[in-house]
């Protein structure tokens, strides 16, 4: 992506501004990581603070100064972000970025808790944390991830605590921007604060320009195939209606989704 065609952020470019970028985690190459990458394009010299950093994200950030937490040293098997809620709360809650004029956090979980004692903190909120506020039932039911039973039990017990922590963390940023009108409503409802505006996520629109119209039938869905995206509902609906559905993407739910797909469902 290039800056002129994909970056819509109305952020300062004052010379010599000391900037830090903060992300919940960098473990894939999805929309969340691409927002961080867009910020990196604007501020290429800004360090990126995050909890864990996996190989799947390294292509995007090969030239970035990524600074991870102590959680990066944990064995890969237990470095799943679902299991590290409390450690991340402690890490970001105690991370004081004193040497920066501007701190920009972006995410849906704990990054917003970072402190910027001597500067300003802008948060780009993807959504109030889904598993605490928006779709807790999706996270508490059995899924395909073998670690889910441990995580589900812990989340049920800790839900009141993590909700209180998340609410307080959401009050820390000086400015909080939503990525959509729906997220704007959620911030008002769950965090009791008025968002300062909407910042649309970057989109690589050059890929779609001058492609021409193509006659197709049915529906298309794409994204990471993880439980909370509920792609199973799209497949179930198209199975029952007998209409075509093209499912694009991959993830831990891929095998389960293929198993439930009827003759009108295709995967790519």
Protein language model regions, located:
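Nucleotide-activated donor-binding/catalytic signature segment of Leloir-type glycosyltransferases, i.e.
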Residues: 255-268
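A short beta-strand/loop micro-motif in the catalytic core of glycosyltransferases
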Residues: 104, 172-180, 246
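Helix-loop-beta element that forms the nucleotide-linked donor phosphate-binding surface
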Residues: 177-178, 183-203
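Short donor-sugar binding/catalytic loops of nucleotide-sugar-dependent glycosyltransferases
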Residues: 25-26, 222-226, 251
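Membrane-proximal helix-turn-helix segments that form the acceptor-binding/catalytic region
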Residues: 143-176
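Active-site proximal beta-strand in glycosyltransferases
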Residues: 102-104, 115-148
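Active-site donor-binding segments of glycosyltransferases and PAPS-dependent sulfotransferases
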Residues: 42-112
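Conserved donor-binding/catalytic core segment of Leloir-type glycosyltransferases
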Residues: 201, 208-246
